[in-house]
Design a protein with these regions (language model features):
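Residue-level recognition of short, solvent-exposed, well-ordered loop/turn junctions
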Residues: 76, 90-91, 136
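Glycine- and charge-enriched low-complexity intrinsically disordered segments
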Residues: 111-152
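Short, surface-exposed secondary-structure edge patches
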Residues: 71-74, 85-88, 132
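Structural motif
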Residues: 79-80, 93
Length: 152
């Protein structure tokens, strides 16, 4: 493939999001400061649709759950990632990628040096992408969802 990076064929639909046109809305209480609390009910701004905000292109969006720790501390085990297949990866985007038919992995894309980087300092190795490597990119990380408690 001569070092060319290709995006995943749109016909492969892993964990595709289908909202069936229905949007769910939740109250928006504005911004929150990390200082002293105030009664949030006094500051209801409007309602937010997470669909409208984060699932703007459901036909080219899927979810994937993080396993492993090569991208810690930014990404942690069991984080949910909203992946966009229609975005072209830019320098330092985090992508779901396979090199030479290896398993797909989450890595930071160093477009300038043509490398895939694990951001965990315990992982010193980067994957250098060579001219003849076959690189398949499933998509670009668009949103990170992390549960703060285990009660959800």
């Amino acid at each position: 493939m001569n070092g060319e990076i290709k995006m995943l064929d749109k016909e492969l639909n892993l964990f595709v999001i289908n909202t069936n046109g229905e949007k769910k809305y939740i109250p928006n209480f504005g911004h929150v400061n990390a200082g002293f609390p105030s009664p949030a009910e006094d500051f209801v701004d409007d309602k937010i649709s997470l669909d409208e905000r984060y699932l703007t292109h459901p036909e080219s969006t899927f979810l994937i759950v993080v396993g492993g720790d090569s991208m810690y501390p930014v990404y942690q085990k069991n984080d949910i990632l909203v992946i966009r297949t229609d975005l072209i990866p830019l320098h330092h985007d985090d992508i779901i990628v396979s090199v030479n038919n290896e398993d797909y992995t989450l890595k930071r894309f160093d477009k300038i040096n043509n490398k895939l980087i694990a951001i965990n300092p315990n992982y010193k190795d980067c994957v250098q992408i060579h001219e003849n490597d076959e690189v398949v990119i499933l998509g670009v990380v668009g949103v990170l969802v992390r549960e703060k408690t285990n009660r959800i």
